């Protein structure tokens, strides 16, 4: 039997590192308090004064001793847990991230550095060995520099492509010292195929795992030895990608950033609610506030969109038998707040089945330059012009004096969150 690994000339071979700042937010807070990150019992909690406040990060000790982790709620933290709660300081985390990224960039050029999230980055060091040594030597130098300058422990996954580097990071490097691991094509049977669950695999979610289970694929070995034609038939190009990923093959190139076409570029905001929202009016209010924020961003960039989408995440996903829903509609190109609110509310009511809501998002796609005003068949030109002027006036006031200087009436209703969230960085206090 031939396999995708049989012809090495067809395999992408680079020296890629996936670097993670271990429990980044919690580590920053530990260092602020003069505690070693591995010795601290700290949880960074958003909205700590609310029972529904979310844990954004927990120190390794906290995870191990109390099983506190990402998305643990405030009400789940018992009094007997000796956990120090810290308010997120996003502006400080961003500054630290910038400084740490500068260290990564000392070992490669910017084209081969790809920030994946605030605490995780990829770098390709294929052409850096003459200057800095082997993969392991480069990883060790990075770890030492970051720890010496910031006190942060970094873990490093090394692979011949981004997938292998990421899998090495998540499944081995993060678990024990020296916080490094290397996964290669020749180790696929002893690494990738030994992963216990499909949905633990990077790029396969729980829904896709269930669909794979339904056709007799229960682990990565099964996926690697499945009928590729069947995978393509069931999942399209995603099926092809999953098949190759199960063999450790990933053709991603860090130097080739995905630059979306203008019709695919979008603007959106999302929010995790601090409690279950069950009343339709309260959900409408939050949708309206988010739509207002998205419309403001569109106008700031002097663009408009013609596809509006809404995402709703349920609090009781198991009871509802699904995690929520998404819906979208095409409209005349617009960046008007009223248009986005009207569409968002319509889409919400078109699919909502009464289940409690915890996540809300609004997004606008198919973007074009806002060069002209689109006239409505249902409103007079005078009213259209007045609405445009109102939006522009609100934008100017907020630009000068901040978001809270002028808010729409619904932001004073029960369930509204925009006023409380105004001034936050990344949804949290700076």
List where the protein language model places each region.
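Residues that scaffold, gate, or flank divalent-cation-dependent active/transport sites
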Residues: 1-118, 122
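DNA-contacting surface of Y-family translesion DNA polymerases
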Residues: 5, 9-11, 18, 208-356
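Short acidic, glycine/serine/threonine-rich loops at helix termini
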Residues: 28-31, 54-59, 164-172, 236, ...
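Short Gly/Ser/Thr- and Asp/Glu-enriched loop/turn motifs at secondary-structure junctions
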Residues: 116-120, 158-162, 303-307, 356-359
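Long, highly charged, low-complexity intrinsically disordered interaction regions
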Residues: 136-197
């Amino acid at each position: 039997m031939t396999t995708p690994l049989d012809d090495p000339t067809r395999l992408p071979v680079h020296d890629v590192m996936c670097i993670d700042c271990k429990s980044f937010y919690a580590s920053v807070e530990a260092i602020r308090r003069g505690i070693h990150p591995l010795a601290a019992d700290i949880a960074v909690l958003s909205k700590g004064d609310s029972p529904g406040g979310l844990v954004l990060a927990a120190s390794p000790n906290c995870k191990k001793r109390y099983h506190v982790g990402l998305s643990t709620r405030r009400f789940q933290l018992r009094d007997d847990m000796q956990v120090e709660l810290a308010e997120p300081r996003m502006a400080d985390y961003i500054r630290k991230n910038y400084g740490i990224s500068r260290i990564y960039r000392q070992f490669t050029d910017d084209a081969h550095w790809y920030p994946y999230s605030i605490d995780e980055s990829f770098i390709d060091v294929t052409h850096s060995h003459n200057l800095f040594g082997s993969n392991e030597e480069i990883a060790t130098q990075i770890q030492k520099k970051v720890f010496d300058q910031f006190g942060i422990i970094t873990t490093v996954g090394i692979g011949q492509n981004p997938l292998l580097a990421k899998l090495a990071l998540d499944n081995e490097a993060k678990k024990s010292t020296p916080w490094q691991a290397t996964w290669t094509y020749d180790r696929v049977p002893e690494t990738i195929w030994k992963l216990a669950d499909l949905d633990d695999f990077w790029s396969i979610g729980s829904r896709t795992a269930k669909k794979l289970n339904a056709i007799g694929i229960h682990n990565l070995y099964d996926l690697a030895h499945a009928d590729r034609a069947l995978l393509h038939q069931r999942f399209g190009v995603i099926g092809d990608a999953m098949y190759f990923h199960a063999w450790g093959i990933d053709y991603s190139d860090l130097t080739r950033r995905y630059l979306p076409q203008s019709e695919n570029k979008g603007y959106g905001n999302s929010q995790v609610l601090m409690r279950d929202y069950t009343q339709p009016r309260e959900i409408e209010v939050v949708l309206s506030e988010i739509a207002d924020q998205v419309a403001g961003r569109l106008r700031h960039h002097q663009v408009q969109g013609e596809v509006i989408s809404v995402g709703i995440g349920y609090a009781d996903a198991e009871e509802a038998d699904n995690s929520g829903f998404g819906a979208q509609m095409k409209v005349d190109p617009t960046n008007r707040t009223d248009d986005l609110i009207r569409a968002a509310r319509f889409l919400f009511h078109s699919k909502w089945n009464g289940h409690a809501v915890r996540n809300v998002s609004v997004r606008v796609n198919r973007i074009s330059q806002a060069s002209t005003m689109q006239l409505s068949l249902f409103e007079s030109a005078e009213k259209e012009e007045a609405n445009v002027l109102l939006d522009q006036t609100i934008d100017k006031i907020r630009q000068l004096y901040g978001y809270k200087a002028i808010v729409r009436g619904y932001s004073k209703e029960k369930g509204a969150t925009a006023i409380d969230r105004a001034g936050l960085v990344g949804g949290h206090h700076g």
